[in-house]
C-alpha cells in the first residue's frame, strides 16, 4: 500500500464538490487515511509550494489557496496511488482535461482547478509530512 496527498482546494469546498471527489477516489478502490478541513496560511503554503515561490503566479496562488478552507487528505491504494489520483484529476487546465476526470467534469478555470495531488512518491512523502507529520 502506498499513500499520496490530495487537497480539495477552496473552490471545491465552496462549490460543495468535496463529497463527489472523495466518492470518485473510493469508487476507484482508494481509501481515505486522514482528512481535515483547514485554513491554509501563507507559511504552510510557502513550504508546500516551495518550487513556485519565485514564480510570477505565486502571489495569486497563495491568495486563492488561503481565501477559504481546503480539505487536506491522505489517500491510500495498493500501488502507484499518486499516479492513479493524478490520472483521475485530469490536466491542470480544466479545458484540456478529458471528460470523466475531476477537472474535466467540474473544473472552470486553470487558476481554480479543484484539486492538488502529489506528483511523485517522493513528493507525496514530503507533502504528507507537511500536513500530517504523525503519518510519516
Per-region residue spans from a language model:
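Non-catalytic terminal and connector segments of soluble metabolic enzymes
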Residues: 1-136
Amino acid at each position: 500500500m502506498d499513500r499520496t496527498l490530495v487537497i480539495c482546494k477552496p473552490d471545491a469546498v465552496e462549490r460543495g464538490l468535496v463529497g463527489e471527489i472523495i466518492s470518485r477516489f473510493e469508487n476507484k478502490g482508494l481509501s481515505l487515511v486522514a482528512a481535515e478541513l483547514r485554513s491554509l496560511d501563507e507559511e504552510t503554503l510557502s513550504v508546500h509550494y516551495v518550487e513556485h515561490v519565485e514564480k510570477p503566479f505565486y502571489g495569486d496562488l497563495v491568495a486563492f489557496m488561503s481565501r477559504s478552507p481546503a480539505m487536506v487528505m491522505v489517500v491510500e491504494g495498493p500501488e502507484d496511488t499518486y499516479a492513479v489520483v493524478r490520472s483521475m484529476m485530469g490536466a491542470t487546465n480544466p479545458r484540456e482535461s478529458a471528460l470523466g476526470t475531476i477537472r474535466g467534469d467540474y473544473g472552470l478555470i486553470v487558476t481554480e482547478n479543484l484539486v492538488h495531488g502529489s506528483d511523485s512518491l517522493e513528493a507525496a512523502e514530503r507533502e504528507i509530512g507537511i500536513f500530517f507529520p504523525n503519518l510519516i
